[in-house]
Structures are given as C-alpha cells and as structure tokens.
From Swiss-Prot:
SUPFAM superfamilies assigned to the protein according to its UniProt record, in alphabetical order: Cytochrome P450
Organism for this UniProt entry: Aspergillus terreus (strain NIH 2624 / FGSC A1156)
Lineage: Eukaryota, Fungi, Dikarya, Ascomycota, Pezizomycotina
Name of the protein this chain belongs to: Cytochrome P450 monooxygenase sttB
EC numbers: 1.-.-.-
Gene3D superfamilies in UniProt: Cytochrome P450
C-alpha cells in the first residue's frame, strides 16, 4: 500500500498529493529523522525522569558580555549579575525557577522564586545543606578541612551565645586597631579603605577565635593574616576553566603552595590546644579560670574524639577565622565607602549613638547597640545595595532524595539551589526607588510597621533582607558580624570625620561569578573630631 493510500484510509478527508519517485530519498531522510527525534525524546525523558530539563536556562554569552561590558577579560569571566537579573524578571517574577551556569563553581544553579523561601527556611541538612555546598564548591577541604558540625556549633551557638561578653572585648580591640591604623590626624589624611576594614575586623576576630595569647603573638598574627587573605584567591584559581575529570587533582596541586603556609598557623595553635588539654586532665578548672575563646568552646563540644584532636580543632578554627576576619572585612569595606559617600547622615547617627551609650554606662553592650536603630538601618541599606559578599543566597545542595518544585518537577539529589538575593533587594515592588541609597530606609519601614501595628498590610520586609542567607542554615556568624560592624562604624563616626578621597563615588564591588568582590583600591580620608 502506498503512503497516499494508507493515509487516505486512516484520514479519508485528508488529501495527500501523489509522491513522485525522485522525492522518496528526501522523504526517507525525513522519516528517519522523525524516528530518531522520537527515540531521542523518549530516551531523554527516561534519563530525565524528574523533568529538570523543562526548567529554562539563562545563557551567558562570553563574547557578547565582553562587548557589552567593554572589558576584554569578560571573555573568560563573564558577568553573572545581569543574567540573573534577566532570569529574575523573565521567570522568577512569573513564579518560575530557572537555571544558570556558575563558572566559579562549574555547575548549574537552580534559582528559585521568592515563594520557596518558606520551604527552605526550616529544611534540615538531611534534605538540603549549606555546609555540603561550601565543601563541594569552595573546596574548603583542600587548604584546611571541611566545614563540619564542630565549626557550625562553635560559630552559631557559642559565639552568638557569648556575644554579651564578646562585645566588651570587641570594643577594646577595635579602639586599639583604630589607634594603630588611623591615629589622631588633625588634617585630612588619606588611608586605604580595605586596610582599615581588614585591621579593625582582624583585631577582635583573632581575640575571639584564638584567645589573648595568640592574638598578641605577632608571628602568629602575620601567619593567620596571610593564610586567610589567600583563601579566596586560591579558592577561585582556575575555577572558571572546565578541567573535566582532572579538576579535583589539579586544584589539589594549585592549593599545594597555600597548604605550605598552614604550619605557621597550625603549629603554635596546636601547642596551645595541647597544653590546655593537658592542664584540664591534671586538675579541675574553675569557671573563672576558663579561657574565653573559640579554642575553649571547641574543646567543650560533645563531638567524637577524632574531631577533638589538636590538629582537627586547629584546622576548623582557621575556617572560623575566615568568617570572622576576611568575610566581615569584605562587607565592611563596602559600608565604609557608603558611609564616606553619604555625609548627610553622619550627625543623625552620631547623635543616636551618643544617646544610646549614655543610657548604658557599660559602653558598647548588646543592650546599647540593640537600640541603635538608625545605625542598624544604615548597615541594612548598605547590605541591600551591595548584597553582601555574593549575589545569591539560600545556597544549598540537595542532600535528600529530591527537592520538589511542583507536582511534575523534582530537583534530584546533588542539585544546587539558590535564591536571587540581589534582585529581590533591588525589586521596586519590595523597596521603592531601589537605586537610591537611603540610610534610614529600614528605620522608617520599622517605624511605619510599629505605628500601624496589627493593621499593617505591609509586606514582611525582613524576609527580603537576605544578605546573610535565610532560615536555620543562614550564616552562623551573622550576629557576630552585625555587632562587629556596628561597633567599628560607630567608633569611627564618634572619633573621626570621614569622606571620599576622590570627589566621584567609587565602584563598590566587582562581579566575579558568584562573588561580589570588594574593590580594595578605594581610598578614604579621615580627620579626628575636635
């Protein structure tokens, strides 16, 4: 039976023209192509039972991005922020997820719309894990050791739980650091903003993590400073090149030089830990004799013995120091630049600080800083404008059997999920005039909510402040970081006038997929207040 006759039998109303003999090769190719396509679609559906392939992809063309940005090296490291913005408005705003390639992680991120915040808020690590994401994509195990429960317990429970006492230490260390780095210049003096941020966060960070003895050891401090400073540099060396199956081996070799500098930190730290364990084994230590630092808190943790060896604790404390020093400094330098760019808010914030400190004779306590709502608003607005250290938050690796998006789509185990922080924070439906820096934006929002009381229909704006992550797996050291920023910025405002060294406001950060790296070349000018 000919094709024409067969078609007429099945669909009698369909008129099919007679097929000429010389058209048969073309039809044969078309038929085979159709069969191949059907087989491919069928096989693809079998290989993709969760239908992840149905999630749209936002592409990042390298050549086009280099042309658009006017920067030649964007061929190798294309920007991330503009393309997440594209996906946010095209898909997330329509309540759809999308995926985008992260060159720094060599993996696709599934970027979820805001409605999934409630779902990830209380997800346990057994279902989706931030620590697993950090270990896999930041390769924390290469230089020091993977993030584990000891790190999370010390950072989240003990550092945050002892903030009341830490605040006293923090104030003293910050004041000494400012005296060293800025001094008391009576004329406007140019100083690098990154240097100020780094040294003022380093001083309290070293004291809290490593204790008074090591924090005053110049050789140890230099070793920690150099090692921590290089973590981010080494973390992204060769990350943007697809190394295939040799990736882990090559990255291990890249970190070899970095690991060589680790003994300068670990040896004295091991000695202190070993000595403390020895003293505790020989006699009872009273509460008054207990050291007040992360070393002691790590020793007190109910974890397995193999996690409490001197070497294991030392390596994990180095990981914690990265968060208390380098990460906080990277955010603080942006806040210093914002502060210098907006002198119109200085006096109002100073007045509030003086009033709050006067009400509490003990100085920078949790109680007094908790009342500094305008200073807090400034910090929140700076974080909103700069998105902290990264343009995505809520980053997790799916560790359970899957992450269900809807009835038809499940992200399988090992999928990388995230929330588009920067775009939510720049959404005019969330924050009116998002491009404008309003230092008292959050102060006014909270005042409006307080005045409206239960009658307020305002959206919960706190759910959109995502710079420190979200939910039970948000940044474990966020309360320490916020209090450090308050203390440092407050002390600077009380003691100094501050302004930009250049008339034009400098660039705040650089889009380095996925990081928003701070610009370290910005200079500010300081002058001691009369």
């Amino acid at each position: 039976m000919s094709i024409s006759n067969m078609t007429s039998t099945v669909w009698p109303d369909l008129q099919v023209p007679a097929i000429e003999h010389n058209h048969l090769p073309i039809l044969t190719v078309a038929l085979l192509t159709g069969i191949a396509s059907a087989v491919y679609i069928n096989v693809s559906s079998v290989q993709d039972p969760c239908k992840v392939g149905s999630i749209p992809t936002v592409k990042r063309p390298r050549l086009l991005d280099a042309y658009r940005s006017g920067v030649w090296w964007r061929i190798f490291v294309p920007r991330l922020v503009p393309y997440i913005e594209e996906g946010y408005h095209k898909y997330n705003k329509n309540d759809q997820p999308f995926r985008i390639w992260l060159g720094g992680f060599q993996a696709y991120a599934y970027v979820l719309p805001e409605r999934y915040l409630d779902k990830i808020k209380n997800m346990p690590e057994s279902e989706a894990s931030f620590a697993a994401m950090a270990n896999k994509y930041f390769h924390t195990g290469l230089p020091t050791g993977e993030v584990n429960n000891l790190v999370l317990q010390v950072a989240s429970k003990l550092v945050n739980g002892n903030l009341a006492t830490i605040k006293t230490l923090m104030q003293g260390e910050v004041q000494k650091a400012l005296a060293r780095e800025i001094g008391s210049p009576r004329q406007w003096t140019k100083i690098n903003a990154w240097q100020v941020a780094r040294k003022t966060t380093e001083a309290p960070g070293l004291r809290v993590v490593f204790g008074e003895e090591l924090a005053n050891d110049k050789t140890f401090v230099t070793g920690v400073s150099e090692f921590v400073s290089n973590i981010t540099v080494y973390a992204f060396t060769l990350r943007y090149i697809n190394l295939g199956p040799l990736r882990d081996f090559i990255l291990y070799l890249v970190h070899w030089r970095h690991r060589r500098s680790l003994p300068a930190v670990l040896t004295p730290l091991n000695n202190v830990i070993t000595e403390r364990k020895k003293v505790r084994s020989n006699r009872h230590i009273s509460d008054d004799e207990e050291s007040f630092d992360c070393i002691q808190w790590a020793l007190d943790q109910p974890v397995s013995d193999d996690c409490k060896t001197a070497e294991a604790i030392a390596r994990r404390l180095v990981v914690i120091s990265l968060g208390t020093i380098d990460t906080v400094a990277g955010v603080l330098v942006k806040q210093l630049t914002h502060l210098a760019s907006h002198p119109e808010c200085h006096e109002e914030i100073r007045a509030e600080i003086r009033e709050c400190l006067a009400e509490d004779d003990n100085g920078w306590t949790l109680k007094s800083t908790g009342r500094m709502k305008k200073l807090e608003s400034f910090i929140q607005e700076s974080l909103r404008m700069s998105s902290g250290a990264i343009s995505l938050s809520g980053m997790r690796i799916v560790t359970g059997s899957g992450f269900r998006l809807d009835d038809n789509t499940v992200l399988p185990r090992d999928s990388f999920i995230a929330i588009p922080t920067r775009n939510i924070l720049y959404d005019p439906e969330v924050f009116p005039e998002p491009e404008k820096f309003d230092p008292f934006r959050f102060y006014k929002i909270k005042e409006d909510e307080k005045n409206a009381g239960s009658r307020s229909n305002r959206r919960d704006i706190r759910a959109s402040w995502l710079a420190f992550g979200y939910g039970r797996q948000a940044c474990p050291g966020r309360f320490y970081a916020i209090n450090a920023m308050k203390t440092i910025l407050g002390e600077i405002l009380l003691k100094y006038d501050i302004r930009l060294a250049e008339k034009q406001a400098p660039r705040i950060d650089i889009d380095l997929d996925p990081m928003l790296a701070p610009v370290r070349s910005t200079d500010l000018e300081f002058r001691v207040r009369a």
